[in-house]
Amino acid sequence: MTSLRRYLAVRHSGWRRPLGRWLVALLLLSPWLQAAERWQSDAYLTESFFEVAMKREYGHEQNVHFSRWEQPIRLKLINEFGDKALQSEVVKVQSQHLAGIIGRPIALVSERPNITLIMTERAKMASWAKRTMGQDASVKTALKEGLCMANFTTNTRREMARATIIIPVDYSRAKGRFLDCVVEELTQVMGLPNDSDKVFPSIFNDNSIDSFPTGLDYVLLKLAYHPALQAGMTASEVRAALPVALKALRASGDITQADQRVQINSLKRWAGL
């Protein structure tokens, strides 16, 4: 077992409880079960999609258009600090998990990337951000407030054109959030860039305990890459297109079976959790 898998096994381990305690646990879980049913409604999915796809985490929310990748995705890992072999494997597993969900290949490359993921030290984050993201106010805010960070640019058609992710391996591991950073930032640069406390259960909710994509996250990714939606759509156009996409996903079982399907080839399964 690798060091990271061993750490995860300890972090997420459970223990056997007497039957009485399980009954109490089930009662305590009943609100969560109701929430699980609630998130599968068209209304909840629509509003959740608007929260994460049509808003921006650090400003720039006016006249937002929907963005996603239309060109082939080429991901490069700059692995300058930490357990490089393990980190490379984590990125490979998570990127291919996302590729399977969105139905678009994500190639791991050494040149001409359009997504660059930088594994570095916290002390070097600002330097990397200045070189790869510029000195926009939103970048400075992310450096000040965030644990890890990502940004993206779009072309004139509002398609995703380039993205950069910076993860401070030392700091994120110390906080027990390394996997959270890899999972959330890679998922966000697929076209779901905003965090929201209104979206639950989800990795996009900073108050959630979820380190890995949930069934709700799976559906949001499926919506983002459904043919009914196109890069460049306005908010009103997205709202008009979502019922078509939701109907198709419901017919295919992608909503009712989301909690099971999100685990296929997932990082969570790779980690043995």
Language-model region placement:
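Acidic/histidine-rich, surface-exposed loop or edge segments in extracytoplasmic proteins
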Residues: 67-82, 163
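N-terminal, post-cleavage mature segments of outer-membrane
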Residues: 36-72
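N-terminal post-signal-peptidase region of extra-cytosolic proteins
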Residues: 51-63, 77, 87-103
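Bacterial N-terminal signal peptides that target proteins for export
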Residues: 4-23
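Metalloprotease/metallohydrolase-associated module, dominated by Zn2+-dependent proteases
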Residues: 39-40, 53, 57-62, 136-176, ...
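N-terminal signal peptide c-region/cleavage motif recognized by signal peptidases
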Residues: 30-35
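Charged, glycine-rich intrinsically disordered N-terminal tails and low-complexity linkers that flank
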Residues: 24-29
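Metzincin-family zinc-dependent endopeptidase catalytic domain
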Residues: 87-183, 188-189, 193-199
